[in-house]
Structure formats: structure tokens, C-alpha cells
Amino acid sequence: MFYHRIAVNVPLSDGLLTYSHSEPLPPGTRVLVPFRNKTVVGIVWEADIAPDMDTARILSVQTAFMEEKPLPQSWCDLLAFTSRYYHYPTGQAVFAALPQGLKETRAVEMPQPPLFYALNEQGRAQTPPPARFNKKAALWDALLLGGMTMAALKQVNAQAARLIEDWAEQGWIETTEAAKPVLRSYHGQASHSEFVLNADQQKASDEIQTAFGSFQPFLLYGITGSGKTEVYFDAMAKVLAQGRQVLFLLPEINLTPQLLERVENRFADVPTAVLHSQMAAGRRTQDYLRAMLGQAKLVIGTRLAVFTPLPDVGLIVV
């Protein structure tokens, strides 16, 4: 029998309780455990420990959700720090940072990786659609570039799904999972804005880029309308083009449909997760997991989104 310290959402001194299981469970694994005559969700915090109590009194883990990917150790370390810093029980800190779907007692389906579409070698050898069919030709050109999701392709041509299905039946289309998104300005459906930075903006963006790959905070100072947004959009584009993740944190009041539309237009072909309290619980949980798995490259959210586990974060914009 193996013993584990498990974080549960209860107001204990540290919110960590000891449970047993027939095999060692990886830290970060979601489990169901008995607590005060009911079943609650827990997160494995420490595995294979030596208990400091009579083992006959230790209850067993009821269910371990082994098909779900464990929360990463870096995330556990961050929540442990948060708990110490704010003198708050670890278990309650952990569950404050989780989306609703991971607090419930049922299994969660893990999201599938996004598909990226492109013309294969046989497709590239075909004659492109005539220019007079401008939407169809635009879709063909986008597939020549490759690295675009179906959502992004539908912004180029609303009939993308049907046309791609037709071309796939002819053997002209290939799909890949988790390909690095290619940021591009494309027929007005711009993921890379046509806005040209002025000298001061370019200097600020260049300075930020010198710190890529290391930790360095920057403060953008400027009056309303001075173009700060374009500076951090430019920096975000550079990080995303490397295939790394960007976390974009906003106050709830600023997270408007207009802003989300602006971001979607700018980064149309980038897999994006949006995390805020107004989202449906199921969608928010799936977006959280997509971010954790590295499937979502751009993560937009309110302050609580800072606790989203990101395996390859390259830039945080606040």
C-alpha cells in the first residue's frame, strides 16, 4: 500500500490529508476521496510518503482519474507558494485556481489537439482556382501557406469546410496536429495587423524582444491612444510565431466582445483559449485544459487566469 498527501477543498491548517492507494499516484492527479461521510475531489500533492499516523486509520482513495493528464509540478509549486505567501490553506488555494469542471466528481474528457490544414504535394501540383472565384482562390492560397486551423480558414472563406472536404476526397489535403501557427496578413483577415509601428513603438517592441527567453518585466507608458496596444500585439506576434504561448491578462471590465474580436482578427490562425467568469463552465474547463496541454497558444483571461498551467509560456501581458 502507498500513502499520499492529497489537497482537498476544506478549511484545515494546510488542506492536505493522507490517503492510501494500491499504487503510487503521480502528483497533480485528480482523485476522489472520502471526507466526512461524503465523496470529494482531491489533487495528489505528495506521493509515496511515510505516514506519521496509525495506518489502520488511513482511508483509501476511491477513484483516480488516470486518463486525465495530471496537473504539472510547476503548477503545484506555484500554488504551494501562493498558499504560503497568503497564509491560506493549500487545499483551498488549489481549488480556487481550478475551473469548475475539475472540481466536480465526474471524469473530464481531455480535449483533442487542433488540426492544421494544408495542400499536400499532389494538391500543390494542381491548377489553382481561377482568380475570378476570389474566395475560393483565397482559400487555396491559404492552404498553400499551410499551418491554419479550420476556424481561421473559415474567416478566409465561409465555405472552407465543404471545399476542403471536396479537395480531401481528391487526395489534395493533409492535416497535422499541433503545428506551429504561421502569423500572416491575409486578404484582410489579418492575424498580423497592417498597422506600422512608429519609431518609438518599434523601439519599445525591439527592447521587449531582447528579453525573450528570460524573465524581464517591462512597463509600457503612454497616454490613451498612443499605441501601447500595437506594441504588445507586435511582441505577442513574435512569440506566437516561435510556437510558444502567450498569456494576455485583462481586468474583467476590459474583456469586452469588441476587444476579443480585435484579438481574434489579429491572431486569427492562432489556437486561443478564453478564461473568464462569464463563460460556460464546460467551455472554460476545456479551454483551461487546452492551455495546459499546450494546444492553445494564446490564452486570454482575467486575473485568475494567471494560475493556468502553461507548459511553454514565452510572454505575459498584463
Question: Where are the model-predicted features located?
Answer:
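Accessory, non-ATPase domains that flank or precede helicase/AAA+ motor cores in DNA-metabolism machines
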Residues: 1-318
